From Swiss-Prot:
GO terms for biological process: chromosome organization; maturation of 5.8S rRNA from tricistronic rRNA transcript (SSU-rRNA, 5.8S rRNA, LSU-rRNA); maturation of LSU-rRNA from tricistronic rRNA transcript (SSU-rRNA, 5.8S rRNA, LSU-rRNA); protein-RNA complex remodeling; ribosomal large subunit biogenesis. The gene is ytm1. The lineage of its organism: Eukaryota, Fungi, Dikarya, Ascomycota, Pezizomycotina. Belongs to the WD repeat WDR12/YTM1 family. Component of the NOP7 complex, composed of erb1, nop7 and ytm1. The complex is held together by erb1, which interacts with nop7 via its N-terminal domain and with ytm1 via a high-affinity interaction between the seven-bladed beta-propeller domains of the 2 proteins. The NOP7 complex associates with the 66S pre-ribosome. Interacts (via UBL domain) with mdn1 (via VWFA/MIDAS domain). It comes from the Eukaryota. Residues 6-89 are annotated as: Ubiquitin-like (UBL) domain. Keywords: Nucleus, Repeat, Ribosome biogenesis, rRNA processing, WD repeat. This is Ribosome biogenesis protein ytm1. GO terms for molecular function: ribonucleoprotein complex binding. GO terms for cellular component: nucleoplasm; PeBoW complex; preribosome, large subunit precursor.
Length: 478
């Protein structure tokens, strides 16, 4: 039986691999897949490349993962249809670069570079090689690392004004300020200063913020306004300032107790203590994550083990919208989306739900990303693309996703659109082990960050910060 054919129209947004107009339309076999199409494009009659370039192909904004015939059948199209194939260079895997060892589990990472939020907020540029990685650990300490893996600064211990228990979240607030929070229910503000040679630095505690009655598991910062958001196991969302003069007096009852007394006895310095600008009773269970709306710093989103995502008006300390999912939520990230913002929510059910936060949205969940085999603990947007993100899970992996790499969900998955990871990043600390940890035991990943200049930075139970170079993974050129 003769093999079917279909007319295709090749397009690209990359001028250096643009076909001449007379070659853009072609009749190709319907049994061809991505690899075959890539061979056709590289051929002498088409692009005539000196060495083969691997290509991926999109039809209506989604990657082609089947034969053209299977695509036509799945979409109810006939072979008389002309298919528009947008071609791009194939995705680049994130390569391992380095690991930075700690004394205890690493709960949090942040990056300071010319392209990071702090770098963009700041007035001075960051020279190549002067990027910094901030880590927070269960040993109660913060560390600032250079890209060579040297810890150029370590925070003070509890006896000198540091955290009295494990750190759960730490962020660069500016080039000279860091905020951290953790199991001791406090947020601490640190002055950060580097020596002229940039080989050493100091972290000096300058402010302690009290208000929560449970551990603080997540903070978000907005440098231009010096504002901080916190999510606590007490179910509340806190709103704070890093300016001592603008912060309210602290509730004295919140700083009493054995740990506070012990610190006052042993420390030789006294750090000012202040309270929150507001505390919002948002959730009926532990609040696990909070973020600023990247487009409007007066709006925030919070998540909880009570299955809800709340949209918050920070100015009025009010809840303006509630979205309820089927499972407890552990992590949040705002994605630019395609035309409008999307919220990615990592759940205890091992998947990531993509939520349209607009009140006018017809459905709560726009897409589901499946692949993790344990809790999804952290999510970060691809800095190079509107379509990409990376997630960290308790299964011991980070997974890179492209929202154009999708399929139709099965009945067991609740139907709908399902995304699958395009790359899986394992922990390098397990590479020499012969047995795979069950459920990520010993290598759970707690946090992940994706920076244009530094790469994908992750932290976990293996006491390591791991760096994988990830720029261009999801191809922003499309």
């Amino acid at each position: 039986m003769a093999q079917g054919q279909v007319q295709v129209y090749f397009t690209t947004t990359s001028p250096d691999i643009q076909l001449p107009e007379e070659k853009q339309q072609l009749l190709v076999p319907t049994n061809v897949r991505r690899y075959g199409l890539s061979q056709i494009l590289n051929s002498e009659a088409m692009l005539d490349t000196s060495s083969p370039i691997p290509f991926d192909f999109l039809i209506n904004g989604t990657f082609l993962r089947t034969t053209l015939d299977e695509y036509l059948t799945a979409n109810g199209l006939s072979s008389e249809t002309t298919l528009n194939l947008q071609y791009v260079r194939s995705l680049i895997p994130p390569l391992y670069e380095a690991s930075f060892e700690h004394d205890d589990w690493v709960s949090s990472v942040d990056v300071y570079s010319g392209s990071s939020a702090v770098g963009i907020w700041g007035s001075s540029s960051v020279e190549a090689g002067q990027e910094r990685i901030l880590s927070g650990s269960y040993d109660g300490l913060l560390r600032v690392w250079n890209k060579s893996g040297q810890a150029i600064a370590t925070s003070a211990p509890a006896s000198a004004g540091g955290h009295t228990s494990g750190v759960k979240s730490a962020k660069f607030l500016s080039t000279k300020q860091i905020a951290s929070a953790g199991l001791d229910r406090t947020i601490r503000i640190w002055n950060y200063s580097e020596a002229e040679d940039h080989f050493s630095a100091q972290l000096k505690p300058t402010l302690e913020l009290y208000g929560h009655t449970g551990s603080i598991d997540s903070i978000a910062v907005h440098g231009p306004s010096n504002r901080i958001l916190s999510a606590s196991a007490d179910g509340q969302i806190g709103f704070w300032t890093s300016h001592k003069s603008s912060a309210p007096e602290v509730n004295a009852s919140l700083i009493s107790g054995p740990s506070a007394k012990r610190r006052k006895i042993t420390t030789s310095t006294s750090t000012p203590q202040r309270g929150p600008l507001s505390l919002m009773d948002c959730h009926n269970g532990p609040a696990t994550a909070v973020i600023f709306n990247p487009e409007d710093s007066t709006v925030a989103y919070s998540a909880s083990q009570d299955h809800t995502i709340k949209t918050l008006d920070i100015t009025t300390s009010s809840i303006v919208d509630t979205r309820t999912l089927l499972n407890p939520i552990l992590s949040l990230c705002a994605l630019p989306g395609i035309g409008h913002q999307i919220i990615a929510a990592g759940t205890t059910a091992r998947h990531i739900a993509l939520i349209d936060p607009r009140a006018s949205a017809a459905t709560t969940q726009a897409m589901t990303l499946r692949g993790h085999t344990n809790f999804v603990s952290s999510i970060f947007a691809d800095p190079d693309s509107n379509y990409g993100l990376v997630s960290a899970g308790h299964d011991g992996t980070c997974r890179v996703w492209d929202l154009r790499s999708t399929r139709q969900g099965t009945k067991d998955e609740g139907l709908g659109v399902v995304g699958e990871a395009i790359y899986i990043i394992e922990r390098e600390s397990r590479k020499d082990k012969t047995t795979k940890p069950v459920g990520g035991e010993g290598v759970k990943v707690f946090d992940v960050n994706w920076d244009k200049d530094v790469g994908i930075v992750s932290a976990g139970e293996d006491k390591m910060v791991q760096v994988n170079k990830g720029r261009g993974v999801t191809r922003p050129e499309i």
